[in-house]
């Protein structure tokens, strides 16, 4: 299933209509019908995607025990960057995860703990035995989000490399963002072909990844083709290219998320996306392709997380305008999720 924006088609149709309306009304009627069919098809695709996301969302029931709907690990947080792992972790909880663990550097731990008593914080990421310490928890985790607030310290990056290897060995889904993507650009083999990996680069990070794995120059006029090609070059792993429209590909198809957001871009909203995607990836893989109508579960999860993040941005901007921050966006997760995915 591929969803493409149709705003450009409408503009083209308007210009063509103006040019030919006086001379050739039958042709105009044909073109207008073509646009109508295109619009109807795109709308149907969007409706289908919303339904597929709803299909993976677990029902709330008193028969479950704590932890069944998601135990998510966040790997990141250093002396300079403590907000990002908090944003990712609290977003996972707000979306519906039951527990969130944050594995961070020792100096970051007291700060992150002070932000919220709801996060379980492990000050181990800069220790000599960090990989072993995180490995102890991997059997209890459903997904990992790697990169928020990580920084580029060599010790931290080397420890994260070992954690990623252990995560793959246990077949745990992993979302990689921020400086986790810096590490991948240095060592693409860490994720090459790992079908439970999702990368979430912005424009700069995407370009860095492209240069790391592809020798040909990027076609800047064909964004969908570029994200498709980068995914293929990395062994058909799922990639979310964040931008004016979010483009999501697994090397076989491209989904476009153009849910209305706002013109406000504040630091941290990518962490909301990665945390949301961590729990949605777990839900989607647990539900399986039968719940996603044969579509890739990770594609559906990624589209859902992108749509949710944009709706949070939209709702917060309506209230706060230019002063909108990621904290304001996170406060809208409940309302946005209910509006989009609750029937």
UniProtKB/Swiss-Prot annotation:
InterPro entries: CARKD, Ribokinase-like. Keywords: Acetylation, ATP-binding, Lyase, Mitochondrion, NAD, NADP, Nucleotide-binding, Phosphoprotein, Transit peptide. Signal peptide: none annotated. One of its GO terms (biological process) is nicotinamide nucleotide metabolic process. The modification Phosphotyrosine is found at residue 81. Residues 49-340 form the YjeF C-terminal domain. Its cofactor is Mg(2+). GO terms for molecular function: ATP binding; ATP-dependent NAD(P)H-hydrate dehydratase activity. (6S)-NADPHX binds at residues 149, 202-208, 271. It is found in: Mitochondrion. ATP binds at residues 242-246, 261-270. GO terms for cellular component: cytosol; mitochondrion. The keyword Disulfide bond does not apply. It catalyses: (6S)-NADHX + ATP = ADP + phosphate + NADH + H(+); (6S)-NADPHX + ATP = ADP + phosphate + NADPH + H(+). It holds the Pfam family Carb_kinase. Transmembrane segments: none annotated. It is an enzyme of class 4 (lyase). The modification N6-acetyllysine is found at residue 63. Gene3D superfamilies: 3.40.1190.20. Residues 1-42 form a transit peptide. Belongs to the NnrD/CARKD family. NCBIfam families: yjeF_cterm. This is ATP-dependent (S)-NAD(P)H-hydrate dehydratase. The gene is Naxd.
């Amino acid at each position: 299933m591929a969803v493409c924006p149709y705003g450009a088609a409408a503009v083209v149709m308007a210009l063509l209509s103006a040019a030919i309306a006086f001379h050739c009304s039958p042709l105009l009627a044909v073109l207008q019908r073509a646009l109508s069919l295109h619009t109807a098809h795109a709308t149907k695709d969007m409706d289908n995607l919303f339904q597929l996301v709803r299909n993976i969302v677990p029902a709330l029931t008193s028969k479950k025990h704590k932890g069944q709907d998601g135990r998510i690990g966040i790997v990141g947080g250093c002396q300079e960057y403590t907000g990002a792992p908090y944003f990712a972790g609290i977003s996972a909880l707000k979306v519906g995860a039951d527990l969130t663990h944050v594995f961070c550097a020792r100096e970051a731990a007291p700060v992150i703990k002070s932000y919220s008593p709801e996060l379980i914080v492990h000050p181990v990421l800069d220790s000599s035995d960090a990989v072993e310490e995180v490995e102890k928890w991997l059997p209890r985790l459903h997904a990992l989000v790697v990169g928020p607030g990580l920084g580029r310290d060599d010790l931290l990056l080397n420890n994260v490399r070992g954690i990623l290897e252990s995560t793959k060995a246990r077949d745990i889904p992993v979302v990689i963002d921020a400086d986790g993507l810096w590490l991948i650009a240095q060592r693409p083999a860490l994720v090459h072909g790992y079908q439970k990996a999702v990368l979430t680069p912005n424009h700069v990070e995407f370009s860095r990844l492209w240069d790391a794995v592809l020798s040909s120059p990027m076609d800047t006029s064909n964004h969908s083709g570029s994200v498709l090609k980068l995914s293929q070059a990395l062994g058909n792993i799922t990639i979310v290219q964040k931008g004016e429209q979010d483009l999501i590909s697994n090397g076989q198809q491209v989904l476009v998320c153009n849910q209305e957001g706002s013109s406000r871009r504040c630091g941290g909203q990518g962490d909301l996306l990665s945390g949301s995607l961590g729990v949605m990836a777990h839900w989607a893989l647990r539900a399986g392709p039968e719940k996603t109508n044969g579509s890739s579960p990770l594609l559906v999860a990624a589209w859902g997380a992108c749509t949710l993040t944009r709706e949070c941005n939209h709702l917060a901007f309506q209230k706060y305008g230019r002063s909108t921050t990621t904290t304001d966006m996170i406060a809208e997760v409940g309302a946005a999720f209910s509006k989009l995915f609750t029937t």
